[in-house]
Amino acid sequence: MKYVDGFVVAVPAENKEAYIAMAAKAAPLFKEFGALRVVECWADDVPDGKLTDFRMAVKAQDHEEVVFSWIEFPSKEVRDAANQKMMSDPRMKE
């Protein structure tokens, strides 16, 4: 069964380019270590909810945007190994 790591994060709007650069750097490494797919989605049309929504989930402030992303792996074992490799790979420290 496939395994997915999902993320919802608040990113200051002025840091959008830096976030995109970081994501573009990390995605090929995740794929090298076994990820099938890496998806990054910068919020465009995220309406405010009444009970909950993406902005409330991450306590986004007015100057922040929501990013929804996920990494798909063939299994949890591959995901666990990939995360270990990512944490120790010197390219992630550059």
Q: Where would I find each of the regions flagged by the language model?
A:
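Short S/T/G/P-rich N-terminal loop/turn motif that feeds into the first structured element of a domain
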Residues: M1-F68, E72-M92
